């Protein structure tokens, strides 16, 4: 198991209120600029895996691994648990974004689990993506394997000015370099586990790009880079020449924007 009095002059009251409003607006802009929300992005029910019956061994196994996974401390932002054999085998995997571990990861996990069980009720297989985490429940043992079938893309509606091809090439080079950083053998956390995540910024012409790449922690380093290379080079058509874009699979993902959206990690 990867187991927050009437005697006072009106002018002072107005100044005080204006200051409070200004502070609130500043906080809102700060949070917005770092995209500290946890928006729902996409989900997919894997109908080919079939459904389970209420009270079945499969459901009991699912509830057991949910309890086991929920009891974790979410410090690494990842867990993979499984139980059962044959038609009663079930596995649950979640991966939180690299800046969303501990309590933020737990919050996203709870939200994702509830939503996935509602959206894919009784399905043996299902995947859900949120801004800060990914969750997959499956009846198929697939840890360490690349998933080429379940992916999607989101992009900014605005195009880059100047040469779209030049912008794309610089963006691709930037993301691939982040992929190398994410899969470096030196990229370990304090528990001596591979981080499988990297973020950075780079100037492209007059603009500054902010980006991140990440893999699920069940992958080997080489497999992680292969996944990132695949989505960056093969699955990014919807992002071509766009001022921002994201590509997700169940194995890896990337994102780039013209504004900072990642909370710096310690």
UniProtKB/Swiss-Prot annotation:
Keyword annotations: Repeat, Secreted, Signal
Subcellular location, record wording: Secreted
Signal peptide as annotated in the record: 1-33
CC terms in the record's Gene Ontology section: extracellular region
All residue ranges annotated as the Gnk2-homologous domain in the record: 40-142, 148-261
InterPro entries associated with the record: CRR_secretory_protein, GNK2, GNK2_sf
Disulphide-bridged cysteine pairs: none
One Pfam family linked to the record: Stress-antifung
Homology family: Belongs to the cysteine-rich repeat secretory protein family.
Protein name, UniProt field: Putative cysteine-rich repeat secretory protein 20
Organism this protein belongs to: Arabidopsis thaliana (Mouse-ear cress)
Lineage: Eukaryota, Viridiplantae, Streptophyta, Embryophyta, Tracheophyta
């Amino acid at each position: 198991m990867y187991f927050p009095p009437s005697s006072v002059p009106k002018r002072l009251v107005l100044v005080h209120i204006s200051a409070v409003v200004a502070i609130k607006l500043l906080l809102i802009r700060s949070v917005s600029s770092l995209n500290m929300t946890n928006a729902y992005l996409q989900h997919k029910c894997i109908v080919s895996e079939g459904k389970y019956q209420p009270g079945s061994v499969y459901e009991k196994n699912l509830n057991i691994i949910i309890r086991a996974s929920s009891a974790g401390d979410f410090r690494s932002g990842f867990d993979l648990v499984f139980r059962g054999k044959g038609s009663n085998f079930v596995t649950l995997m979640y991966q939180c974004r690299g800046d969303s571990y501990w309590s933020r990861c737990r919050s996203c996990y709870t939200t994702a689990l509830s939503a996935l069980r509602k959206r894919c009720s009784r399905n043996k297989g299902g995947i859900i993506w949120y801004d800060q985490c990914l969750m997959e429940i499956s009846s198929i043992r697939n840890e360490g394997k690349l998933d080429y079938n379940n992916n999607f893309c989101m992009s900014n509606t605005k195009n880059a000015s100047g040469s779209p091809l030049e912008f794309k090439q610089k963006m691709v080079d930037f993301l691939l370099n982040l992929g190398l950083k994410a899969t470096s053998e030196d990229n370990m956390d304090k528990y001596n586990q591979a981080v499988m995540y990297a973020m950075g910024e780079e100037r492209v012409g007059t603009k500054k790009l902010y980006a991140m790449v990440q893999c699920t922690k069940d992958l080997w380093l080489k497999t992680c880079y292969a996944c990132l290379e695949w989505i960056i080079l093969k699955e990014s058509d919807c992002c071509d020449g766009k001022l921002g874009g994201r590509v997700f699979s169940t194995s890896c993902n990337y994102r780039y924007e013209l504004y900072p959206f990642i909370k710096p990690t310690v």
